[in-house]
Every structure is written in C-alpha cells, then in structure tokens.
C-alpha cells in the first residue's frame, strides 16, 4: 500500500521548513543581490540584507505561536534557545537549524509543473529561481505541532514535533531532532478513528544528518508497520541522501545562500517498488526554505517535471 506524501518527499524534507525563530546576522542591513552577499545568508525581496528576527521591521517568516519574547536572543545573535546566528560558512550544523514545536511559516506551493532542478550558472555560481509565480500557486501556513496531548503521543514518546508532509495530503510526519540528525519516527493522521493512520519506522529514517556540507552522503533503510487508513500495513522505505550542490535560491521571500540535499526515496511494498526524487534547499537559521519533488519513478537526477514545488513566501 502506498502512503501518499510519506517521508521527506513531501518536505524536509518535512524538515518542514523549520527555520529559526530569532535569526540574527549581528549587523546592520545592507544592499544585496543574493544571499551570499549577506552575513545572514538572506537577501530579502527588497534587495536588503537582514538581520531577520521576530521583532525586525523586515519581518520574520517563522513565528512562535507560543508568543515568547525573543528580542534579546535576536539582538545578541545568541545561538542558544530560540536565537540563531548565520555564519555563511557552507556548513550547517543542527544548532543552525533550530527546530521545535510551535513554529509556523508561509509556504507557496504549486503542483504538477515544469521546473528545471539544474538551475543556472551565473558568474560561476549555481542559482535556482523559485521567486516567480508558478501555475496554480497556493499559499499555506506550515506549522510544527506539539506531539504532547495528540492522540498518537504515546506511540512516539521521544518526538520533538509533528508537521504536515505534503500539500496533497493531510498526513503528518512525526519528527525527532538531535545534534546529529533530523529523524522521521512515523506517519500519522491528524485524527484518530476507524480510518486512522499510525505507522512507525524502525529504525527511524534520517532525511537530514548534521553537519551538512557539500559531499556529505548517508543512507537509511527503515521498516514500517502499523495502520494506514485503518488497514494494517508492512513496508520498507529507503532514503539515499547527499548534499550535492551549494548556491543561491531565489524565493518570493528573498534570496538565500543554500546547500541542496538530494534525496532518492524508495518505497517498497512486497514486490511493488516506487522511487521518488526530491531536492531540499537548506540554509542557516531558516532550515528548509524550499523543496522540489519529482513525479513517481523519475529516472533523471536533474528533472523538469515536478509533482510539487514548495518555497518560503512572505
């Protein structure tokens, strides 16, 4: 049985775009053309580098629904707690992608469109442009939800948060963060009942392993058991991941200096094997700012037919 939207193929790289609340560059705003021009790694759509923080006039794509006062973290660039300082060193650690329950951001999503994942070379640097309007664009709030109190909480006692994996499905990925990885513990439906989904991975899948830097590669294979739409299921999922490029990603929110994580997701049920490719674009503090997912059984590493394109928006 195929669970649509399963795994990183719907997010972060379900990282669910969990960037940092309180990201600070530690300096004044300056003019920019690309994220690489900025100490924060962020060139906003108005052509100005930010400090990007919860109280900045420029706005922050990710806010805390808990309403904590994080102005001190933002101003000092403290990497502890909710703060984060981008250093644009082409290495992203877990501390530079703070993820927790209670964050939300706006993402703009289009489905079944043409987009060349290879991007373009501009002045000897790779550039991907997702700032333009795409056919069928829809804005949606992506949230990192608390697991405590949810109907599935007892199945995932070590979880950090849950988040929706895909615009085309209401299934939630249940994630755990650590200094070395972002792991998917399982997939659940938002509500319990006769048609509920509650699938657990053993061992957990790791779509992201830290630190991220060009050339890093890892593979995880997980067996999954549980219920999908009320039906018992057993299958396996394999994630082949590699940080294969660095460059500049243009989004409706602004331009970011990013590392691109290439993921080949193989879903096996009995003798039926489905392969899906995805690219996650990850940057300091914001985390996953865009994801491009292929159609099923795409054979090309760089593809042009995308099942879903999701990127951060104002």
Regions found by a protein language model. Give the residues of each.
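Sec-dependent bacterial lipoprotein signal peptides
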Residues: 1-22
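Ser/Thr-rich, Pro/Gly/Ala-heavy low-complexity intrinsically disordered linkers and tails
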Residues: 15-84
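Secondary-structure transition/turn motif
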Residues: 48-56, 186-191, 294-298
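Acidic, serine/threonine-rich low-complexity disordered tracts
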Residues: 81-159, 220-314
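Extracellular-facing segments of soluble proteins and assemblies that are Gly/Ser/Thr-biased and enriched
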Residues: 151-238, 243
């Amino acid at each position: 049985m195929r669970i649509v939207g399963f795994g990183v193929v719907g997010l972060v790289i379900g990282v669910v775009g969990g960037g940092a609340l309180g990201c600070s560059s530690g300096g004044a705003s300056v003019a920019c053309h690309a994220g690489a021009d900025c100490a924060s790694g962020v060139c906003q759509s108005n052509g100005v580098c930010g400090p990007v923080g919860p109280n900045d006039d420029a706005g922050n794509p990710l806010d805390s629904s808990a309403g904590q006062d994080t102005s001190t973290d933002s101003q000092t660039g403290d990497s502890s707690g909710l703060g984060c300082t981008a250093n644009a060193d082409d290495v992203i650690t877990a501390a530079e992608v703070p993820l927790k329950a209670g964050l939300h951001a706006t993402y703009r999503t289009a489905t079944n469109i043409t987009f060349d994942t290879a991007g373009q070379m501009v002045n000897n640097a790779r550039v991907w442009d997702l700032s333009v309007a795409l056919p069928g664009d829809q804005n949606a709030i992506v949230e990192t939800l608390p697991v405590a109190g949810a109907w599935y909480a007892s199945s995932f006692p070590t979880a950090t948060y849950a988040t929706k994996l895909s615009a085309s499905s209401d299934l939630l990925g249940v994630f755990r963060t650590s200094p070395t990885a972002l792991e998917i513990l399982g997939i659940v439906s938002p509500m319990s009942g006769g048609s509920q989904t509650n699938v657990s991975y053993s061992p957990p899948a790791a779509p992201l392993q830290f630190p991220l830097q060009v050339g890093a590669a890892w593979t995880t294979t997980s067996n999954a058991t549980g219920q999908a739409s009320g039906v018992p299921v057993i299958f396996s999922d394999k994630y082949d991941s590699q940080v294969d490029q660095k460059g500049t990603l243009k989004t409706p929110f602004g331009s970011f200096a990013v590392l691109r994580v290439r993921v080949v997701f193989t879903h096996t049920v009995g003798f039926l094997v489905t392969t899906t490719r995805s690219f996650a674009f990850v940057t300091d503090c914001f985390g996953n700012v865009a994801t491009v997912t292929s159609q099923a059984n795409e054979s090309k590493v760089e593809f042009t037919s995308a099942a879903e394109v999701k990127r951060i928006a104002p």
